[in-house]
A protein has these predicted regions:
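Flavin (primarily FAD) cofactor-binding/catalytic cores of flavoenzymes
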Residues: 2-39, 43-45, 87-193, 197-445
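A conserved beta-strand/loop capping segment in the N-terminal third of enzymes
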Residues: 65-98
């Protein structure tokens, strides 16, 4: 067993832990290694649909927001690969997911702290350190701190959990499966960006010409991503700090209100989709027009021939049946800590709903020594807000974690922005308090 433990061991190598590794590359005194079961870096390769684009700025990359001179930036990727001037001439409003995935892979190839084909089987805390049982290592890997970044798990609705996997699968597998859907009735479940992209691919015949297309969504309509300037303020360090300070009921209320800030359909995708649907009767004469069913809650499913889906219309509360040969689930993801942490499970603090509790430094509360932390990325949507699961603030979060790890502010993490001002200023005059007392019990608009 090594006598010199790591300062940080990362479990999982997705974009979020990759960001931490990229920033730590400039800190040779910090000993860090990151482990993943995959043979090489990949990022949602099963969802790299033709024409799919990122829903955030390419400047919100692994490092630029806190260290613009870092060599692992997206701009340096363009320069080093001879793409900078062509990129400028392309004048694209958003880069493709394929290019962003290539950028992430380029960074991964240039980092020596990453260990692929090394799944972590279990983690224990012994003798003042975390001990990781890693495949390929004869002795445990010891580390003073952990950072858990194992990503997200596809959410399968309970109604669909027993359907045959060859005929009902999650959209994250789409490009791996490359299904032949020619002549089949296809139902897409889920009204977000991935659902829209799958439907667009079906309309374009990417997987063959289906006999019928049905799109079911629980949302009341197929709604756009809100990319307007003031909504984008939710994706700033100042707003995250403000959000953290609120009580849980208020945070839940805000998350419901802000859903379309992170989980809508890109307006460009919606426009293209609507135009395809408008042209469909002319371009596909004699074929049934695609059926769009928003405002439906999925109740039950039967896996016979064909698959039968039972949904309830939220408008009139009536039940409807949809029959399909294939069902593609665009139903989002779940956040779970990996099974390798089960030996530590009883030591992690949970809230009343059974969720883990990341603090302002993204460290989970546990009963171990305060100087041995378990950082977790993408586990704090309720505590840190709508930006937590997005790429937008990943380098800022990485900087917060690294500053906390090393004990001083190496990176700027307070943006100082005051537009808009989220909190009230203290009353400057006693007359303000008297005015408030006089009207405190009135209703407001």
């Amino acid at each position: 067993m090594s006598s010199q433990p790591l300062d940080l061991a990362g479990i999982g190598i997705g974009p979020f832990n990759l960001s931490i590794a990229a920033l730590l590359d400039d800190h040779p005194s910090i000993k860090a290694q990151f482990f993943d079961s995959k043979p090489s870096f990949s990022w949602h390769s099963g969802m790299q649909l033709p024409g799919s684009r990122l829903q955030t700025s390419c400047l919100k990359d692994l490092v630029t927001g806190v260290d613009p001179r870092n060599r692992h930036s997206f701009l340096n990727y363009l320069v080093q690969n001879g793409r900078f001037y062509d990129f400028l001439s392309a004048n694209m409003p958003a880069i493709s997911r394929a290019e962003y995935a290539d950028y992430l892979g380029w960074v991964a190839q240039n980092l020596t702290s990453l260990r692929f084909s090394c799944p972590v089987r279990s983690v224990r805390f012994e003798n003042g350190c975390f001990e990781l049982d890693v495949t390929g290592h004869k002795t445990p890997v010891r580390s003073r701190n952990l950072c858990v970044g194992t990503g997200i798990t596809p959410y399968i609705p309970p109604a669909c959990s027993n359907l045959p996997e060859d005929r009902c699968f999650h959209s994250i597998e789409m490009m791996h499966r490359q299904p032949d859907l020619a002549g089949e009735r296809v139902t897409v479940v889920g009204g977000g960006q991935s659902g829209a992209e799958i439907v667009l691919g079906l309309l374009d015949g990417t997987w063959g010409e289906p006999a019928g297309i049905t799109w079911i969504s629980r949302r009341p309509n197929f709604e756009p991503l809100d990319e307007t300037p003031f909504t984008n303020q939710y994706f700033t360090p100042g707003y995250v700090r403000a959000f953290q300070s609120l009580d849980e009921s208020r945070r839940r209320e805000l998350l419901r209100y802000q859903k379309l800030a992170s989980d809508g359909i890109s307006p460009d995708t919606l426009n293209t989709l609507y135009q395809r649907l408008y042209e469909y009767p002319l371009s596909h004469p004699g074929r049934p027009v695609p059926e769009l069913l928003p405002g439906r809650s999925l109740y039950a499913a039967s896996g016979g021939e064909p698959i039968r889906l039972l949904s309830r219309n939220q408008m009139d509360q009536r039940f409807e049946e949809t029959q399909a040969d294939r069902v593609i689930l665009c139903t989002g993801f779940e956040h779970r800590l990996p099974e390798c942490l089960e030996p530590l499970g009883g030591r992690l603090k949970l809230d009343q709903a059974g969720r883990h509790c990341p603090d302002e430094h993204f460290a989970l509360e546990w009963d171990g020594p305060a100087d041995c932390r378990i950082y977790a990325v993408n586990q704090g949507r309720l505590s840190h807000g709508v930006a937590e699961s997005q790429l937008s603030l990943m380098c800022w979060r990485s900087a917060v974690i690294i500053n906390h790890l090393i004990g001083w502010d190496r990176y700027p993490v307070d943006d100082g922005g005051q537009m808009p001002r989220w909190f009230s200023e203290p009353a400057r005059h006693s007359s303000t308090e008297r005015f408030a007392d006089e009207h405190r019990h009135q209703t407001y608009f």
